[in-house]
């Protein structure tokens, strides 16, 4: 089913984009939550009228995201963890731990913005991307050290 997005959806595209999605996804999620409208000729005309406003909104959001990316890029957080004799962590470092460490440094991000593929289970230094906007992903440095 073809739909026109009425808001930015990370997995699909930006506002105003016409995309093809599964019928059930459109009927059960996108359309009821007003995140998209059916791609009919009438809706295309309405979207064209709103496009200028949306493009200005996207430009403003992207500018704010790039400013935030400059603040975040290269931020180094150090997390202490209990380790075994083989330098394996008891437990792991999760997204919430990184979010809390960033908050202590004055950088407020949502958990969903931190793109950690899997929990960190070893000591060392890791580069973790943070998605602030579509295509804008600065990296932070997470250092895991043993607790004294």
Curated annotation (Swiss-Prot):
InterPro entries: Ribosomal_bL9 (IPR000244), Ribosomal_bL9/RNase_H1_N (IPR009027), Ribosomal_bL9_bac/chp (IPR020594), Ribosomal_bL9_C (IPR020069), Ribosomal_bL9_C_sf (IPR036791), Ribosomal_bL9_N (IPR020070), Ribosomal_bL9_N_sf (IPR036935). SUPFAM superfamilies: L9 N-domain-like, Ribosomal protein L9 C-domain. One of its GO terms (biological process) is translation. One of its GO terms (molecular function) is rRNA binding. GO terms for cellular component: ribonucleoprotein complex; ribosome. Gene3D superfamilies: Ribosomal protein L9, C-terminal domain, Ribosomal protein L9, N-terminal domain. Pfam families: Ribosomal_L9_C, Ribosomal_L9_N. Transmembrane segments: none annotated. Keywords: Ribonucleoprotein, Ribosomal protein, RNA-binding, rRNA-binding. Belongs to the bacterial ribosomal protein bL9 family. Binds to the 23S rRNA. PANTHER family: 50S RIBOSOMAL PROTEIN L9 (PTHR21368). HAMAP family: Ribosomal_bL9. This is Large ribosomal subunit protein bL9. It comes from Desulfatibacillum aliphaticivorans. The lineage of its organism: Bacteria, Pseudomonadati, Thermodesulfobacteriota, Desulfobacteria, Desulfobacterales.
